[in-house]
Structures are given as C-alpha cells and as structure tokens.
Amino acid sequence: MLYPSIDALQRTIPSKYTIVTVAAKRARQIQDGKAPKVAEPKSYKPVGQALEELFSGDTTIIVNEKNNG
C-alpha cells in the first residue's frame, strides 16, 4: 500500500489534479538536487517523497488566481 494514500491526501487537498501537479513539480525539484523537506522519508523515489511532504504540510500550495477578463 502506498503512503500516503490518496484518501489521506484529499483530506487536506481536495483536488486530485492539484495533488498530482504539485507533487510532480516538487518531485522534479528533488530529482534535480533539492533536499527533501521530510526528515526521514519512507520513500526513496522523488514522487513518493514529494507526496510525503504534501501530507505532512512541509510543502505549501500557493494559488494564483488570475482574472481572465
């Protein structure tokens, strides 16, 4: 079973699309050499580490609302 589960992540971030997008961007940063923000990640893969960061609250999401008018 994967940790954290999608159900657990959706308690804090309701949109699956947002979870995937943010995790992918953060995983790319980790893969490019940035250190994971979780002290002892359970996953050794960047995507798993990014999801753990989202679940623990170590990675925040900034919503940029643009007016398309």
UniProtKB/Swiss-Prot annotation:
Task performed by this protein: Promotes RNA polymerase assembly. Latches the N- and C-terminal regions of the beta' subunit thereby facilitating its interaction with the beta and alpha subunits.
Native species: Exiguobacterium sp. (strain ATCC BAA-1283 / AT1b)
Pfam families, sorted: RNA_pol_Rpb6
Subunit and interaction comment: The RNAP catalytic core consists of 2 alpha, 1 beta, 1 beta' and 1 omega subunit. When a sigma factor is associated with the core the holoenzyme is formed, which can initiate transcription.
A GO biological process held by the record: DNA-templated transcription
Record's GO cellular component terms: DNA-directed RNA polymerase complex
Domain of life assignment: Bacteria
Keyword set, alphabetical order: DNA-directed RNA polymerase, Nucleotidyltransferase, Transcription, Transferase
Xref: HAMAP family: RNApol_bact_RpoZ
UniProt family annotation: Belongs to the RNA polymerase subunit omega family.
Gene Ontology terms for molecular function: DNA binding; DNA-directed RNA polymerase activity
Catalytic activity from the UniProt record: RNA(n) + a ribonucleoside 5'-triphosphate = RNA(n+1) + diphosphate
Family matches, as SUPFAM superfamilies: RPB6/omega subunit-like
Name of the protein this chain belongs to: DNA-directed RNA polymerase subunit omega
Enzyme class: transferase
Database matches in InterPro entries: DNA-dir_RNA_pol_omega (IPR003716), Pol_omega/Rpo6/RPB6 (IPR006110), RPB6/omega-like_sf (IPR036161)
EC code(s) of this entry: 2.7.7.6
